[in-house]
Regions:
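Short coil/turn connectors between adjacent alpha-helices in alpha-solenoid helical repeat scaffolds
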Residues: 74-84, 119-130, 175-180
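Short Pro-Gly-centered flexible turn/kink motifs
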Residues: 581-603
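Extracellular polysaccharide-recognition and catalytic grooves
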Residues: 134-374
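An alpha-helical repeat/solenoid feature that recognizes helix-turn-helix modules
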Residues: 55-76, 101-121, 157-174, 213-217, ...
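Bacterial N-terminal signal peptides
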Residues: 1-10
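Helix-loop junctions that connect tandem helical modules in alpha-solenoid scaffolds
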Residues: 52-55, 94-101, 146-154
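Extended polysaccharide-engagement surfaces of secreted carbohydrate-active enzymes
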Residues: 255, 259, 274-574, 603
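Low-complexity, Ser/Thr/Pro/Gly-enriched N-terminal "stalk/linker" regions
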Residues: 16-88
């Protein structure tokens, strides 16, 4: 385990004197971005960061992120600052340099946002030459990914309606089109949100399959920010969604600055998702005074955590890819400059919002940890009910925030462990980005070669409490047949399951029932963990080091414990797992109900 990860896992509540959000952003994050952009200005297309060529052609958003990053730095200095003309000249040169490069969807939004910022301060004409601006007016258009006949998205998930809407609104402000397109896109965006969120207020990333993740909670805040950015008030309906998203994120506030815990694109984006939602909620005035204080204290800790953990002093870059860390292939290291710029922008614009609210230079609340102790210990967030239930249980246990999502990863994500129906908690329990190993769920390999797993189809979810213990029960009338891009329901096995969560311990008990005798090649389950130095006795493993103290599996033929030695297949967003417990059942015919389970205790 790396020294950096050891320090992260063993750190208790933050002891350093609280520093204002503005101070961290302006003294730690903005100088880091300015240094990267200085390297870009010096090296141009030859620019390399930590051995990675910036202009590889693989980042479809890079020109827009460069434009927004330059605008963020340019506008952070006063108009009479001697650096301002140099920054404007650099923007002009790099705009001309990258104008013909691929720049899609989010990149278009970032670029038009940068241009509107420059227009508002009267710097657009100086920062972009006329020929380049003429090209940009044609290319920075939402119509490149929206069918103008019926306003459906072209090969993009439904959250891209928000991107298209933002581009259209900004084009109106730039004087490039009238408001008709943005109004139609707003209607489509809100229709989708209503259709697939129902009464609960969270966006399904799919057309009703049930993928509710970080982005499902973040999207309401992004929509609100598009209105704020373009100078108007979000509709009341959007404000209601923001409030619901804020509830989810308030339940996740912690003293470390850790972020959202499950699904794709977490790591630093899990942290900034919480920052963006809480900031939007503050900006549209849906938080009370105590919630404002908690939110501000959290965003300050989040910025500190980002600067201390995610920024690499040796390379001068954000690091999501090395030191045993792993992120989605979508955010590979080929996007190194763009990822630096987009994460930093999320801190820049949210810091500006808090400054406008009167928090510039204000230290966070001094009794933050005590205030966290007073937060509710349990919250149940329903995403959908119907043929299948989709829900998120959140528990607070000491410094841990534990999330148990019962959702469906849907097409492209159902087979990846960050979407499994298992507990997640920063620094304690994690999935593996794009990872397919059977983390805390059994995979049934049948005689015909099919692999079945209990991942997607939840019914009759019930959540009850008994003192400090929370009990979750559900059934699955069918399980997920793996191997395809989308989940496939398979009724050859049914499941009834019970989770029991109490302070310091989580237990799962499953009963799998075959509809008819099944030829099994085997059953496999794993538990990969940050804990180290495991000693095994029968099916119980006790760990000498790390957050998990004990793991016990039941119902399996055998379990084996091994050290992982920074195995690339077992890396998580914050660093590598240290150990793995592998449990198996050998080939047999399954005729009767089979009881399997596990229990883990944590420090």
């Amino acid at each position: 385990m790396s020294i950096v990860l050891v320090a992260l896992l063993t750190t208790g509540a933050v002891d350093a004197a609280p520093v204002s959000y503005n101070e961290i952003v302006e003294t730690r994050i903005r100088p880091q971005v300015a240094q990267l952009l200085e390297g870009l200005a010096t090296q141009g297309r030859r620019y390399v960061i930590d051995g990675t060529a910036v202009f590889s052609g693989d980042d479809p958003f890079l020109p827009g992120k460069i434009a927004l990053g330059l605008a963020d730095i340019l506008l952070s200095v006063p108009a009479d600052d001697p650096r301002r003309p140099a920054y404007i000249a650099e923007f002009r040169r790099l705009a001309a340099l990258t104008v013909d490069d691929p720049n899609d969807t989010w990149g278009i939004y970032y670029y038009v946002s940068a241009l509107e910022k420059l227009r508002k301060v009267g710097a657009l004409g100086a920062a972009v030459d006329r020929a380049t601006l003429a090209k940009l007016r044609v290319r920075l258009d939402w119509r490149t990914f929206v069918d103008v006949d019926d306003f459906t998205l072209i090969d993009h998930p439904n959250n891209y309606y928000g991107v298209a809407f933002a581009i259209a609104r900004l084009r109106v402000l730039l004087g490039w089109e009238d408001a008709a397109g943005s109004e139609r896109l707003l209607t489509k965006m809100l229709e989708h949100y209503r259709q697939f969120s129902g009464t609960y207020g969270f966006a399904d990333e799919t057309d009703g399959e049930g993928r509710f993740d970080r982005y499902s909670v973040l999207l309401a805040a992004e929509i609100a920010q598009r209105f704020i950015e373009t100078g108007s008030r979000p509709p009341d309906e959007v404000l209601g969604w923001v409030r619901k998203s804020a509830d989810v994120m308030l339940a996740r506030i912690n003293p470390h600055g850790d972020g959202f815990e499950y699904g794709r694109s977490i790591g630093p984006y899990g942290t900034t998702a919480m920052v963006e939602v809480l900031t939007a909620a503050a900006a549209v005035h849906v938080l009370n005074e105590q919630e404002m204080a908690l939110a501000y204290a959290y965003v300050s800790r989040a910025a500190q955590y980002y600067a201390d953990f995610w920024l690499n002093a040796r390379t001068g870059s954000l690091d999501m890819w090395d030191q045993g860390r792993r992120t989605d292939a979508y955010r590979g290291k080929f996007r190194i400059l763009g990822e630096n710029l987009s994460v930093a922008h999320q801190f820049f614009y949210t810091n500006a919002a808090w400054n406008e609210l009167g928090y510039r230079g204000k230290p966070p609340m001094p009794d933050f940890e005590r205030a966290l102790d007073r937060l509710p210990k349990r919250m149940v967030t329903w995403f959908a009910r119907g043929e299948y239930d989709r829900v998120l249980l959140t528990l607070r246990d000491r410094d841990y925030v534990i999330g148990l999502p019962l959702i469906n990863g849907g097409e492209s994500q159902h087979m990846h462990s960050p979407y499994f129906p298992i507990p997640f908690a920063p620094r304690l329990l994690a999935g593996i980005a794009d990872g397919n190993s059977p983390q805390l769920v059994p995979y049934f390999t049948l005689g015909d070669g099919s692999v079945l797993a209990p991942l997607a189809y939840f019914q009759d979810v019930k959540i009850t409490t008994r003192g400090t213990t929370t009990i979750v029960t559900f059934r699955q009338p069918r399980v997920d047949k793996l191997g395809g891009r989308a989940p496939v329901p398979d009724g050859r096995i049914t499941l009834t399951s019970t989770y029991t969560l109490s302070p310091g311990r989580i237990t799962r008990a499953d009963v799998y029932t075959p509809r008819e005798p099944l030829d099994l090649k085997g059953i496999a389950m794993e538990f990969a963990t940050y804990a180290e130095d495991g000693t095994q006795k029968a099916s119980t493993v006790r760990f000498a080091k790390g957050p998990v103290q004990e793991f016990k599996a039941t119902g399996f033929d055998q379990c084996l414990t091994e050290a992982l030695h920074d195995n690339p297949d077992y890396r998580t967003p914050i660093g590598p797992f240290s150990s793995k417990v592998s449990c198996r059942i050998e080939s047999r015919t399954l005729r009767e109900p089979l009881t399997l389970g596990w229990s883990l205790a944590y420090r």
